[in-house]
């Protein structure tokens, strides 16, 4: 049986680290005027994927 192909969109969005997978926070690209400074500040940076989603991310990225 051939190797499973990776989902190219998933490989662009998720990065494997020693502690799990990190990803960019959503809701930060546009329509930012109605969001409070506190909300925008908390959405900054990268977050780790929840443990319940790790198996599906591994399948999509073929890690």
Curated annotation (Swiss-Prot):
PROSITE patterns for this protein: RIBOSOMAL_L35
Protein name (database record): Large ribosomal subunit protein bL35
Region (Disordered): 1-22
GO cellular component: cytosolic large ribosomal subunit
Lineage: superkingdom: Bacteria
Organism the protein comes from: Marinobacter nauticus (strain ATCC 700491 / DSM 11845 / VT8)
Family annotation (InterPro entries): Ribosomal_bL35, Ribosomal_bL35-like, Ribosomal_bL35_CS, Ribosomal_bL35_sf
GO molecular function: structural constituent of ribosome
SUPFAM superfamilies: L35p-like
Entry-linked NCBIfam families: rpmI_bact (TIGR00001)
Alphabetical UniProt keywords: Ribonucleoprotein, Ribosomal protein
